[in-house]
Regions:
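Structural recognition of the conserved hydrophobic beta-strand(s) that form the central parallel beta-sheet
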Residues: 95, 119-125, 146, 155
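Interdomain hinge/linker elements that couple catalytic modules in large macromolecular machines
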Residues: 162-350
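Conserved catalytic segments around the Walker B and adjacent sensor/switch elements
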Residues: 43-61
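Short regulatory helix/loop adjacent to the ATP-binding pocket of P-loop NTPases
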Residues: 111, 128-144, 156-161
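Pre-Walker A adenine-sensing motif
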Residues: 2-18
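Short glycine-rich substrate-engagement loop in P-loop NTPases that contacts/grips substrate
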Residues: 56-89
Length: 450
């Protein structure tokens, strides 16, 4: 089963605009559908293709890259001979799948693109890419596209639903509530998406009517794969990325979700673990959210990287991690989450899905922690804005509520302290759309529209 993915249109743009002058690199975590997408695109948009899967190719294929790059006529002659087909020039594509496993193929892109006979699509897991490029020249002829797990709309498409998202978009655009019945139905579907997640294998199992035990088993295998790859990186670089990754659910259970190194090692300090944290975030299996010391438009200039939160890249994987040691069956636990009856801290799941949706929408993730003395108080208290983004050249603060709770003290004190001119102020919560007191309240499923 091949799912419809939004990034397909970006590949079309690359093909048209590049005109063979760059290769495209699909970057992302393992098991998010990069290889499937590349193959589907090759079948649909070219007359012919060759797939080089470097997890399977033998040394004969690899030796072509090592021995024939100085003579590209010989390179293609030997490649076509070993693959049993000849490609039409200017009408065909060659896929370098899992290129991280054979960095010399990636380095060859510079010469192959300059040659101009064929287009090239590369796919790679960022965990392995980052550790395997130390000794090669990264080609400037690469156009990189970041790919993420399936978002809510893609999940709806996979379920055969082309109706729901246009309704959500219309409500958001017109700033009108959907109505209780429609909102309740969409929230149930969205909770199902949170539970299943956006990993294509898990979504496929769900659309086939498989039990949640089976879906959870698939996701556990993906988590094990991530942890084993991180462990390999740790062994080679004397880092603790695998430990950092494993503690994410426990970190998010903290009252304010801030990352505490004491949960990794009681004597741990940021400076000793900064590379491991960066590796988890840059590998796109985790989403880092950084504190800014001032709510200014150039948020990155005020980033305090030692004060951060770390979310999982896919909320469905977080759900599986949370439920790992639960006494109940996965079937019962998943249904409890879908029907909003789960006894565990749902706030961490909801905050994680909002972080994921904002990241997929193209935002870097920041939050703001500040001290303020409210009127009538004799001492400063600490407050926090969950997320801060920039829209229309103005700061846009975002608060996330795991229920219908509408308190907005943090917004009020933020405006009071900094005399801030904001774009919009959003509270993302579990109820229907509404506007009140200068604040826009949007349901969880609209977070990706910001």
């Amino acid at each position: 089963m091949v799912f419809k993915r939004k990034i397909y249109s970006k590949l079309l743009d690359w093909k048209e605009l590049s005109s063979g002058e760059t290769a495209v690199m699909l970057e992302g975590a393992r098991r998010i559908g990069k290889s499937t997408l590349a193959l589907e695109f090759a079948k649909n948009e070219y007359e012919d293709y060759i797939l080089l899967d470097f997890a399977k190719e033998n040394n004969d294929i690899k030796n072509i890259f090592l021995e024939n790059l100085s003579d590209l006529d010989a390179f293609f002659r030997n490649l076509f001979l070993l693959k049993g087909k000849k490609l039409k020039e200017k009408k065909s594509v060659i896929i370098f799948d899992k290129v991280q496993l054979f960095p010399q193929a990636r380095q060859a892109i510079k010469y192959l693109v300059a040659d101009g006979r064929y287009d090239y699509i590369e796919t790679g897991s960022l965990i392995s890419i980052k550790k395997n490029v130390k000794d090669i020249l990264i080609p400037s002829e690469e156009y990189r596209l970041k790919m993420y797990p399936m978002d809510f709309e893609e999940f709806l498409w996979a379920c055969g639903d082309e109706v729901t998202m246009p309704v959500i978009e219309d409500s958001f655009k017109k700033k009108k509530p959907l109505g209780e019945a429609s909102h309740r139905k969409i929230m149930k579907t969205f909770r199902t998406y949170m539970a299943v997640g956006g990993m294509p294998q898990a979504v496929k199992a769900f659309t086939e009517g498989r039990p949640f035990d089976r879906i959870d088993f698939i996701k556990r295998n993906i988590l094990d794969l991530y942890e084993s790859e991180l462990a390999k990186y740790d062994d080679e670089n004397k880092e603790k990325a695998s430990v950092i990754y494993k503690t994410i659910p426990e970190q998010l259970e903290n009252k304010n979700s801030h990352f505490r190194f004491s949960l990794v090692d009681k004597s741990a300090r940021y400076k000793n673990y900064v590379e491991a944290v960066n590796f988890v975030a840059e590998s796109m299996i985790g989403n880092e959210c950084i504190n800014v010391t001032k709510p200014e438009i150039m948020l990155e200039l005020f980033a305090d990287r030692s004060n951060f939160k770390l979310y999982l890249g896919d909320t469905g994987l977080l759900v599986t991690q949370i439920m790992k040691n639960a006494d109940e069956t996965a079937e019962n636990l998943y249904k409890s989450l879908i029907f909003d009856k789960l006894s565990v801290n749902q706030g961490m799941i909801i905050e994680n899905i909002v972080a994921q949706m904002l990241k997929v929408s193209g935002y870097d993730l920041y939050f703001h922690e500040f001290l303020h003395m409210p009127n009538g108080s004799d001492k400063e208290k600490k407050y926090e804005i969950d997320f801060m983004i920039v829209k229309s050249k103005k700061i846009c603060p975002i608060e996330v509520k795991s229920s219908g709770y509408k308190s907005h003290k943090s917004f009020d004190y933020l405006i009071d302290k900094y005399k801030l001119k904001t774009s919009d102020k959003y509270i993302i919560y579990t109820k229907d759309f509404k506007e009140e007191d200068g604040i826009t309240y949007i349901p969880l499923y609209m977070a990706g529209l910001l």
